[in-house]
Amino acid sequence: MEEDVFPKAYDPKGLEDKLYAFWEDAGMFTAQSASNKPPYAIIMPPPNVTGILHMGHALVNTLQDVLIRYKRMSGFEVCWVPGTDHAGIATQTVVERHLYSSLGKRRIDFSREEFLEYVWEWKEKSEGIILSQLRQLGCSCDWSRLRFTMEPLASRAVKKAFKVLFDRGHIYRGYYLVNWDPVLQTALADDEVEYEEKDGWLYYIRYRVVDSSDEIIVATTRPETLLGDTAIAISPDDERYSHLLGAKVHLPFVDREIPIIGDMSVDPLFGTGAVKITPAHDRDDYRTGINHNLPLVNILTPTGKINENGGIFAGLSKEKARDDIITALDAMGLFVKKEPYTLRVGVSYRSGAVIEPYLSKQWFVSVDSFRDSLREFVASDSIKIFPPEFTRNYLSWVNNLRDWCISRQLWWGHRIPVWYHKSDEDRIICYDGEGLPEEVAQDPDSWDQDPDVLDTWFSSGLWPLTCLGWPDVEAKDLKKFYPTSVLITGHDILFFWVTRMVLLCSAMVGEKPFSDVFLHGLIFGKSYKRYNNLGEWTYISGEEKHAYDMGKPLPKDVTAKWEKLSKSKGNVIDPLEMIDKYGADAVRMALCSCANRGEQIDLDYRLFEEYKNFANKIWNGARFIFGHISNLTGKDLADGINQNLLGLEDYYILDGFNRLLKELESAYQSYAFDRVTTMAYEFFRNDFCSTYIEIIKPTLYGKQGNDEDRLTKQKLLAVLLVNILGVLHPIAPFVTETLFLKLKEAIGVIVDASSDEITAHALNMLRADSYVLAPYPQAMRITIPDNLHASFALAERLVYTIRNIRGEMQLDPRASLEAFVICPEGVSVDTYVPMMCALGGLSSVEHLTEEPKDRVYSLGVVEGIRLGVFVPIEQITKEKNRLEKEKIRLEKAIESVSRLLGSENFRAKANPDLVSAKEEALKNNRMELQSILDKLASFS
């Protein structure tokens, strides 16, 4: 074969871009909503519009694409809708930083409209980057349906959903404690808060009872919130303090008197048994305050500093105020002591700031009326969660769900569609139409629109509907593809996003948004730390880290650990770099191979190298086949295959392929992407290349069989190649498509149909312009011999015996040897001879009735079949010398151990285990010596 037509190594560079352009330009990814095919739809989890492709994106989109390609080939009308997320907090933060670094200006230096112009400009520039990167990965999305969470359709959907929920009484506004991010200056939902354990202090503070010499000591982790205290609470059953119930204590610095109240929520065993109540800055205290009708005193500004309610501490940061308050209390004799204490601190998932419980007027979705339906969808298996163990997590979370704070103090996002009358804020209009509400348009100076925007997850929660055309209930895509088939996402946003979609979509249209949810694990990378003599450590990066990733042994001062991907830890793997270095197929297969269904995916860097080599194996396997089927035509395949000419190895590979298809179907149904990849990998590499092709090589080269046998093998190779590449296509689309197009070109235009049970479907596949449009491989209807697997297993054991003899005799693996067999009565190995010769490196197998006396051979026995391999003359002397040396070594070892075991002193003093070990060693050495003596005798 011409080298320039089919180079020896697969080089994906250049090929991948051309193939993707071929697919996209031909409209192969475009779904037809009028199709009669069964629907299969996936809505892409939208990446942030300002982001770039990271390994998590690469994983989730590879898994989706594998399913989409598989289902498209399986006869479904597939619709994979791509899109990007406006990502309110994240995008606004990025643009603010950009404006400050480039112009030296902050957001507040612009009007809202001016700032949003910059954000839209940023969006237009950056959106194309991640979309082009998805193309590099091979994602076969329907780009004609590209969506953005703030496009006009999405805006209509969001306003419609808000108004529907508002009119039904499911959305309300009020002053409540929210999770406040003092850096971003916005409220966050409960599940946007991450919790960390930090070392802190438990401070003991003395409160003096008014008009009494009594005092009460309280333990707190946040002494600065003393400024907002409105009560001291004790357990009503706590006899230590029962005499103080109803009394008041003096609150220092702010000159207030606050009551001592009884509340059953107080734990008498924690601290001193008395707790300070700060309803405006603690959720538990808030509930206590409501129950006891206590005032709510907010002491913080939106930036996290002490406000005017803090008296002399106003304007200080909470950290500075804490220190100054403790110093002042100490001077007043009111500070008792402090003790080390481990704190559970809430942190913003976006800014990393410590979250403050903060009293603020916000919009909420009441979830109580949705709780039953959220639970029922999953409990009834209407929505199935994979892996199923996450079902328990989902149901537990739903049972403990609190009202969802949906307002955000941002400029970038969906503006809340509510207007307030300037003279009466309780007079409001909720409007979901275009432009202004009629009443506002008639008197615009008297109305203000709510300045806040909706939580990003509100618009994302409508994503399956938005992508398919809602709120137009007659939209063709909505009718054809809703509910969608499966949602694939990381388990970390099960509550952020998955539950919100179930809630909002079902509330809008009365139906679930998807049938299945597959939650993949989070990617971990290996990090390496180097420790010095002082116990200090640093993370290792660069070439040294890469060397360890590729298997270099670790020195004593370096330790390795699987950790979440982090630039600071040096364990981030850039998927674009991997694509450039190894090719998109290698990256896809590596990710699929480790896409287990647990919580953590340990992404071994060596997988990329392994699957690059496998892509090359696919290429070279096909290259070999092309060299032997160049004379085949479509007519040859249409003529079919004479099953009477099929050998054991042919039936075995065909049956194996049929079994593979069944196992793959099961794996796809359970979203076992790792099994899909591993099974396809092992079948191609081991069963097809290393076994089947090696067995039939003598026939292909004309050393066995006749021309008709050779043509049969050639046809079967072509059929198997197009089918196996078809199985591999969803996970490795580029190399398989390249080979498919070459195969079509080699075989030529296929005109004739075929009814042959082996070739018919392969011909149908080859009629397609691309694997993208080709039907998925089907099981071939063949009659399998009853004893196929037992026979093949026997043949494999015979081959293993031959290889074992070659190894023991240290025979040249390239040398072609002669062998003989002596079979029990009624047993024949004729069927196995081609396989024995091809895989065992034999030139011939002679049938004898007794062992030969005139030649040297090495003998093995398999199920009563005596198999002898003749040793070449030149090897005999060399092997005899080796055996003689080994004989001497064993004789010395036997003598030494025998002498030791014969010593009564040794047996009396030695550990019984040591004695047993020596006896076992002596036994093994004697057996090995006898084996060598037998071999030497065979040379005589």
From Swiss-Prot:
Compartments, record wording: Cytoplasm
Reactions that this protein is recorded to catalyse: tRNA(Val) + L-valine + ATP = L-valyl-tRNA(Val) + AMP + diphosphate
Pfam families: Anticodon_1 (PF08264), tRNA-synt_1 (PF00133)
Short motif 'HIGH' region, span: 47-57
MF-aspect GO terms: aminoacyl-tRNA deacylase activity; ATP binding; valine-tRNA ligase activity
Keyword tags: Aminoacyl-tRNA synthetase, ATP-binding, Coiled coil, Cytoplasm, Ligase, Nucleotide-binding, Protein biosynthesis
Coiled-coil ranges per UniProt: 872-938
Similarity section: Belongs to the class-I aminoacyl-tRNA synthetase family. ValS type 1 subfamily.
Role according to the record: Catalyzes the attachment of valine to tRNA(Val). As ValRS can inadvertently accommodate and process structurally similar amino acids such as threonine, to avoid such errors, it has a 'posttransfer' editing activity that hydrolyzes mischarged Thr-tRNA(Val) in a tRNA-dependent manner.
Assembly and oligomerization: Monomer.
Protein name per the record: Valine--tRNA ligase
Biological source species: Chlamydia felis (strain Fe/C-56) (Chlamydophila felis)
